[in-house]
Amino acid sequence: MRPKLRSYLAWLPVLLLVVPVILWPGYSMAIQELIPRLSLDLTYDDNILFSRRSPQRDWIYEVRPSLSWRYRTERDILDVMAGLHGQKYNTEHDLDTLDQDYRLYASREVFFGTTISLNARYILDTTLDEEFTEEGLLLSRQERHVYSLEPAVQWQATERSTWAFSAPVYHVNYEGDKNQDYSTEYLTLSYSYLLDDEKTSLFAQPSVGFIDFEYGDTKVYEMMFGVGREFTERLFAKLMAGLSYTRSHIDERFEPIGPFSIKVQDEEDYSKTGWVGAGELKWDWDRGQWNMNFVRRVSASGYGETLIRDRLTTEASWRITERIHFKGRLSIGQVKSQSDKTLRSYYYDYDDYVTYDVSPAIVYQLTERIDVQAYYRYSLIDYKEVSDTRHRNRFFIRLDYRDVWFGQ
């Protein structure tokens, strides 16, 4: 990791303490919310390690307590959240975990039309579940530490045009040596313009990114244009597309296999040009809603190289009765190496694969604050270059409590 980034991350705990004080609102009418939440899960998993050769089954007892505090004034927003996720396996006790999640979001309108903000987060979790859900990537099961920091500024230049600038920093550290740590730094400029019809907006977004791996680095340059339209009060669509250009360097690498060391990676320099894009569709109904998102982007990964990731995600909910509603999620993704060479390691064979993930659920509202939920989740990974297909079925029963306490 570069010294500059090390220094940046070292200041993260300080920023988490100092920024709320700097952005603390002056005297004005404020709305505060304290939100406690507790979820209790009983889960059956028929392939806890997502293995093809020897799937293991187990029952898992899960508890998720969290506490959020929200502060609002006309000029200021301050959100703080702390959450835990404990998992206790019925037989595989060495897989027991206690995940942690801490978040901070603060923003202030410093003068008319200009808002500064900071988004920070620290996560401790495991790769096998969380990284697959978030990124569609299958990595060896290890603890994952994630540090993210995103300062931003937004300027409402006119009634129709808005400029925004952000500089997100992201660092991932994996326990052990099966996955490779990486860091990313991006600079992103966004511009939007609302047309005279008051429903259609045009977008432009250039960005430059720097990715550091343990055995290489990548520079990413992207330019995207797009259009968004609010067809009705309930239907909105947005589509962005553009070009990306990357320059990558990969170091020569060896891995120990018993008493020997074998070369698993040649030194390589290469550049790639391709297209990137993002789209979203939101549709609200009287008794539910439907959202769909698509993204194609150049992405860092725990494999130690950049990937091209395509992912389509759709979510729907439907209220059947006053107390019962259905919700579901479907995600389809493809992961492909940017390198011309098939980079394989002792742990991975990951050059090209497709993932499918579907999770329907029924939710019953016991009381105003308590829900009972029944989930099913099916996951599939299909490797294109080798004969390897992996399946995973999970069943969940969840008791969910959520309350909101108000104050001024």
Regions found by a protein language model. Give the residues of each.
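Intrinsic disorder/low-complexity segments
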Residues: 1-4, 22-25
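Bacterial N-terminal signal peptides that target proteins for export
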Residues: 2-13
